[in-house]
Amino acid sequence: FLMILPFLILCFLFSYFPLHGWIYALYDYKAPLKLSQCQFVGLKWFKTLFSNKTQVMQLIQVMKNTFAMSLLGIATSFLPVLFAVFLNEIKCKWFKNLVQTLTTLPNFISWTLVYSIAFCLFSTTGMFNTVMQNLGVISEPLKILDSGRHVWLQMILWSTWKGLGWGAIMYLAAIAGIDQEMYDAAKVDGAGRFQIIKNITIPSIMPTYFVMLMLSVANFLNNGMDQYFVFQNAFNKSTIQVLDLYVYNIGMTGRSLSLATAIGILKS
């Protein structure tokens, strides 16, 4: 018991103790007042979620965005696997290290900096529009960032670019753990590179992939908000707003911290 006691304490402090904040969903809380100074409203905010037509429509759109981004994330979860396999096939050590470093580096860049890069490249005055206009390909700048069209595609592309190299590290470790005698035996039998990948490498890392896939499914509603927050603007707000960002917008910049708490409870 003493060995697991530190784990139990940390689990309580970080997983259960913060739940006392759920009580705000039962009050009409107005910052910076104390909770005792606010009116007790019971289940009012929970009823508002399903009785207010505007609120219901917003919530439906938010859930649609959340489900879409989660499904796209799951659908592209195989990309780090393929990248790890191809990276493992690079025989030139220095080039392999260079590629791995360059593809892992974006993971350590904040989403604020990623948006700055996107703005420099794809804003109406950015490099892409400037080059296309100078070449005569387009007459008017394309509103890539200032539009609600293709937002889901943009988000998954930026997310893939940022996390591809980092996501491949675990699969590279799994590949390193494969028994080399299997490769030697396959080469003796005359198997080619693609046959070895198909019959040895990929099947051997599938258990790792399915574990990561199950973790992704378990966090289906947890898209985070950093990426969507920095890319959010008045033009794409309706299509980029996922559940975590919606809770933030309502609680910090919207109508009510209490309503945001109620939505957070339903998410849990």
Pin down the residues of each PLM region:
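A structural signal for multi-pass alpha-helical bundles of membrane permease subunits
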Residues: 1-268
